[in-house]
Amino acid sequence: MGKGFYISKPVGIVSIILCAGALATIIALSVVYSEEKAKNNNQVSPTDGGTTSKPPVTTLAPSNEPWDKYRLPKNLVPDHYNLTLWPRLTPDLTTGLYIFTGKSTVEFETTEETDLILIHSSKLNYTILENGHLARLTSVNSGVRVPLIKVSWLQSVTQYLVLQLDGKLMTGHRYHLYTKFTGELADDLGGFYRSEYMEDGVKKVVATTQMQPTDARKAFPCFDEPAMKAIFYITLIHDRGTVALSNGEEKGYPVTIDNQHVQKTVFEPTEKMSTYLLAFIVSDFDFINNTIDGVWIRIFARKPAIAAGQGEYALNKTGPILKFFEKYYNSSYPLPKSDQIALPDFNAGAMENWGLITYRETALLYDKEFSSNSNKQRIATIIAHELAHMWFGNLVTLRWWNDLWLNEGFASYVEYLGAHEAEPDWNVKDLIVLGDVHRVFAVDALASSHPLSSKEEDIQKPAQISELFDAISYSKGASVLRMLSDFLTEEVFTMGLRTYLSEFAFGNAVYTDLWKHLQMCLCTRISRTLRPTVNIIFPQMGFPVVTIDTKTGVVSQKHFLLDPDSEVTAPSPFNYEWIVPIKWMKTGAVQSPYWLRGKSATNDAMKALGTEWVLANLNVVGYYRVNYDEENWGRLLNGLSTNHQLIPVINRAQLVDDAFNLARAKIISTVLALNTTKYLDKEREYMPWESALNNLDFFYLMFDRSEVYGPMQDYLRKQVTPLFNYYKTLTENWSKVPDGHMDQYNQVNAISLACRTGLEELKPSALSVVMLSFFRIHPNLRSTVYCNAIAASGANEWEFAWSQFKNATIATEADKLRSALACTKQPWLLNRYLEYTLDPKMIRKQDATSTIVYIANNVIGQSLAWDFVRARWSYIFTQYGGGSFSFSNLINGVTKRFSTEFELQQLKQFKEDNAEVGFGSGTLAVDQSIERTTANIKWIAENKQNVLNWFRDETKPVF
């Protein structure tokens, strides 16, 4: 958001007052939002005139047949596909379903003789061809006998089209496999699917795709593994007046097919690429464009969004970010165009399809009057994340999904670098500590965590692949790569990336290939080996806590576990020890780096005398937590109290986060952790405050139903008051927002916590006379104001907010309202809202699970949401996609407040009751929730009274 956007002084005051209860603030927001799409409940399989298929054959018992294995054999290698698809954007007259038809010819080479063809296929109906089978096989090589197809069938469990031949395919020969098929253009957000929206009272339909990780097979038969790269010749048939897009540049012309006047769009052949990076879209969207150094950049979205200028920010930032990565990789962008499109329905945040990146609307579209500072940062970082993939992931691709972290961890690291290039005044690179390092510590500290890199044979099924799209792959990957870049130096790190990309361009690699290149570049600088360090980091889960005893200089490490009583069953070849790079300072002076290479060692330089203090892991570049002897903790706390700016701002955030988590792990006392917050009345920086609030959220979750809640509120209200007054002065009594990016974030923290704790100035009685004023609320403050307003209101106000949500035309505004609707204190409204989540007419499928989590975040809604998920799990899982990445977030979200034996038993029963249904990508989250709940029960039993006493002592009146 630009710093020139202000609100008037009296309006600013009212906007703060209303966080205590005036829903009238929402009245000013009268905008038109697209109606929710109607769900087609007809479950009939899609058909097309004249097409039939043999019934699927499913093997009921385990077998060793190739078609019962989830991995393709290596004897067939695709070269290219000729694919024509025709999505129908109106329902089929016979079935009432939206369908697509297609035909495909794939050319492949035989690398080993075989009489069996396996090609992935899911939820497709095939036309029986003239040979009586589901496919036709011909030879590319002249004079070569082509075996006949003896039998063809669909193996639904492992998702294959199987062709048994009457003879062998010859090694070194090439063949064509032709199929004709029909699929449903469903609203399931996977494969080739349907998105809907309303425009000027008319329902519009978009045909779009999401292939990653294993849904290209839902769009056409293909060798659907990342190492099976090929060239794709794509043709789309579509209604005239609509626009067709795919990975390559397009050329369209009108044709007539079966007396239908349609458009035929032919795309330039792709580069050699993986199936999961394919995309094809048909819509009547509009676009804006620019050309930078010969690369055509286009931003597509709904016509009203483009007309309103919502694509301008993305267009303006894409070019600089793209140029940054060209320089960073020392490699030109390999395609002639870069299309980015905002979709009304999209399950992930964005997808890096090569040349056609797809986004949720909230991840690409920015409106200066409705989008907040955090919305803008999200757009910049997600664009950078996806553009980073154009080289790291697309040009060079993982060989198999067990190395997913190499794709996603790398993009999650350099997204901060790319966003910094786009917005250098933000200091966004520092935020990786809060957004990724601290985030993943919470997961990786569980005994049920998993290593960055799994064994290939352990990741076979689509659900197992989906499980890997988690905080470990994204955030731990980013954190560890940042650490490597730091101790190797950015120069060596980027040099290794460049040689790696050069060697494996248009091919596939494993993570050890990258280490080889980093090692080669390291050896050009110093004769030090990288292998021991990375070998220890990547095959074992978790991370260490490093303890420094400043009395003796002894530095030691152990595996950090949030619950020290939990049992680690996964063996480690390194016994959960790490080689730890330690950057540190003594009393404000930076010291020489130190490497801990064993369980413990002595470093005399780390002894502290008198008032000296030691602080390790400067700027949190290392992937570990730090503990100290009690005396050094005391000196650090004294330093925070007397001259906190002597400690780097990132490390002030680190001290708070480390202390609270060390206390949860019983390594230090909870009282010591709470003492790290006492200096906050002097703190004005965002990162320490955000770190404190993130950790105090755990206290809210554990104690907002107990007698601890009142004294805790009193203490936090006391601590936030100076920050609140600071921003009140800085913004001239709330007449504007601060200039700085971090200051804007911290202003929101100050207001949110002041509202949450009932600061007197924000109570309705203070300025009730102006509470009915009509005005606009700054986008940064809307989430806070809306939530507090709805929490203090009743059913009529909730209904009004619901109507504003349904009519919102700005995706970020709709998201704020959708979240705020979960803040009501009326149980019946929350129960009804839960029912809405499973009705796509009310809540889009992409938003269903996050809405349930919003409701669970409400102390009143938590038990309602949990009961709802338990009762509806089978329906949620089957109707909302067993491979959806969002199930882990759902399970973690509805169970994070669990802290009683009763809730633990319910959770275990939930796991047992739904074992047959399954949990898909949430499988690991169930075990993590059980482990987390067990730890919470113990922690409350051991700490509740001490915490209560501490808050009471800190809020006693001073006479």
Label every PLM stretch briefly.
Residues 437-438, 442, 477, 549, ...:
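Long, ordered, helix-rich scaffold segments
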